[in-house]
């Protein structure tokens, strides 16, 4: 079993670019069919570590779905981000959905 550093609904920050994001899904290892050079560097060992589906915002505030290696992400300590409140809302919504049990018929 591979342990992941981040969890679904957690806010993270891209280490190189500094963008704020929210983890929406986790793959135990790289799982896209054909990796491009941008997605996986020449070091193939990155494929064996967790990869994260992360929602970030572009410069216009529109959501972008990204697929990032664990090594590219860092912890985000601040919970409230007035400049990107939609990401705060998304993170809170995901966390509430994961905590609240749902009845299924």
From Swiss-Prot:
Localization: Cytoplasm
Broad class of the protein's primary localization: cytoplasm
InterPro entries, alphabetized: Hemimethylated_DNA-bd_dom, Hemimethylated_DNA-bd_sf, HspQ
GO cellular component annotations of the record: cytoplasm
Pfam families: YccV-like (PF08755)
GO molecular function: DNA binding
Biological processes annotated in GO: response to heat
Annotated keywords: Cytoplasm, Stress response
Family that this chain belongs to: Belongs to the HspQ family.
Role according to the record: Involved in the degradation of certain denaturated proteins, including DnaA, during heat shock stress.
Protein name, as recorded: Heat shock protein HspQ
Lineage: Bacteria, Pseudomonadati, Pseudomonadota, Gammaproteobacteria, Enterobacterales
Chain's gene name: hspQ
């Amino acid at each position: 079993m591979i342990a992941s550093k981040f969890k679904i609904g957690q806010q993270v920050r891209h280490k190189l670019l500094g963008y704020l994001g929210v983890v929406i899904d986790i793959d135990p290892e790289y799982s896209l069919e054909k990796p491009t050079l941008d997605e996986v560097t020449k070091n193939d060992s990155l494929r064996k570590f967790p990869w994260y589906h992360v929602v970030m915002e572009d410069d216009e505030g529109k959501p972008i779905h990204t697929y990032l290696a664990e090594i590219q992400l860092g912890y985000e300590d601040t919970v409230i981000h007035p400049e990107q409140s939609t990401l705060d809302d998304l993170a809170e919504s995901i966390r509430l959905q994961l905590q609240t049990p749902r009845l299924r018929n």
